[in-house]
């Protein structure tokens, strides 16, 4: 049995809590589509199709895998009842595809959920043909106000590993460098929005994010209250709106020739 984090419980609310503004979503799809011209692509952790459905609509030939059947069922619903590409319930650390089956691979906000993330990356590289490309967005709010609040909440709740898998871009760079790939940063995409500190804390308290799933309701409430006390000391009113800028950072890894 895998120890990767499964998103069965999040299927019904995932899109509501992870959606981007239409113009931001278009910018992400255009950015990735340019890298995928003429290539078939496998997305691991395809989920509800948040990225893949847009790429398919833009003309990319795709396949997708996910550990969670409810997430894949939501993808089918989002697609109008029939997925426009092949989807398979599978563990990213053991992909059911032959070597060099695809021209590209894609991993968005998934490697941090896989303790054996290095195995998943090697598997994804295995199914990508030579001179193909691997596209990765690690995600996470690090370095932002929301990231600081998440860290304070998890510390108060004594969550030891909010991200049980990959949490360091340099580790990914090092592994792929060992595999002969060349990494490059794609143009960042900015998603601006406004939120209060209370809203940020409430989202953690409600258990929407996988980093809080190991906690009981009582533990989340206690951590939220501790975080509120800290935030009031540091920032004053919890109801004041803050401009929050999410920077979406994709990296491309060009795989070597055989």
Where are the predicted features?
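Conserved class I S-adenosyl-L-methionine
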Residues: 1-37, 50-54, 71-74, 78, 133-164, ...
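Class I SAM-dependent methyltransferase SAM/SAH-binding core
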Residues: 42-44, 48-94
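Conserved Class I S-adenosyl-L-methionine
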Residues: 48, 184-258
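A conserved beta-strand element that flanks and buttresses the S-adenosyl-L-methionine
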Residues: 106
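Short catalytic micro-motifs in class I SAM-dependent methyltransferases
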Residues: 109-113
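A short glycine-rich, Lys/Arg-flanked "PGG" loop and its adjoining helix->strand segment in the class I
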Residues: 118-133
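Short alpha-helix
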Residues: 164-179
């Amino acid at each position: 049995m895998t120890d990767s984090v499964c998103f069965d419980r999040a299927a019904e609310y995932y899109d509501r809590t992870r959606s981007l503004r239409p113009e931001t979503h278009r910018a992400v799809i255009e950015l990735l589509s340019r890298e995928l011209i003429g290539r078939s692509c496998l997305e691991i952790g395809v989920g509800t199709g948040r990225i893949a459905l847009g790429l398919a609509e833009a003309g990319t030939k795709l396949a997708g895998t996910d550990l969670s059947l409810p997430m894949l069922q939501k993808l089918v619903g989002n697609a109008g009842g029939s997925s426009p590409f092949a989807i398979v319930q599978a563990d990213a650390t053991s992909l059911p595809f032959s070597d060099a089956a695809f021209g590209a691979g894609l991993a968005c906000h998934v490697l941090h959920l896989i303790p054996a993330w290095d195995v998943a990356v090697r598997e994804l590289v295995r199914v990508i043909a030579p001179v193909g490309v691997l596209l990765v967005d690690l995600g996470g709010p690090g370095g932002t106000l929301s990231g600081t609040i998440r860290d304070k909440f998890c510390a108060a709740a004594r969550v030891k590993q909010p991200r049980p898998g990959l949490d360091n871009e340099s580790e990914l760079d090092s592994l792929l460098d060992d595999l002969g790939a060349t990494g490059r940063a794609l143009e960042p995409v900015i998603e601006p929005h406004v939120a209060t500190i209370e809203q940020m804390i409430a989202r953690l308290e409600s258990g929407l994010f996988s980093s809080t799933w190991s906690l009981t309701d009582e533990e989340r409430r206690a951590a939220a209250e501790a975080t509120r006390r800290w935030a009031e000391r540091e920032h004053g009113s919890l109801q004041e709106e803050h401009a929050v800028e999410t920077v979406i950072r994709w990296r491309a890894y060009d795989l070597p020739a055989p």
